[in-house]
């Protein structure tokens, strides 16, 4: 079935944020992964390097992002492009939550500050 209903999504928690997975190999996608992230107010993101290009579309709130040391704020309707290999961090410095839709390709992984590789379950 080409429709993945919200009730069929998989919810994951990490670093205080909620990742709701919709498209991934586990859900029948062969090339793309897509999820919604919700970051509570006052949450500082964990900087990490990404193995694949990542696109974030901000749905609500203000997302503070850092890409290879360049910092900026993205609000509803804005898009953040994160190149493969970039050092990336996303934070929410406001009081309310921020939500974004994230898309990348299958095989996405991150390198955490301690040097360990992490393949997120919402992208597998």
Task: Please annotate each region the language model reported.
Residues 1-31, 115-124:
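A short, N-terminal "cap"/entry segment at the start of jelly-roll beta-barrel domains
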Residues 19-21, 35-50:
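Conserved short histidine dyad/triad with adjacent acidic residue
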Residues 27-31, 39-43, 60-62, 71, ...:
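Short, charged/polar surface micro-motifs in flexible loops or helix N-caps
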Residues 34-36, 81, 95-111:
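A short hydrophobic beta-strand segment most commonly corresponding to one strand
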Residues 40, 50-51, 58, 83, ...:
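A short, compositionally biased micro-patch
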Residues 46-47, 65-66, 82, 88-95, ...:
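Short beta-strand His + acidic residue motifs that chelate non-heme Fe in jelly-roll/DSBH
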Residues 51-63, 68:
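Glycine- and acidic-residue-biased ligand/ion/polar-headgroup-sensing regions
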Residues 69-85:
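Short acidic-glycine-tyrosine-enriched beta hairpin
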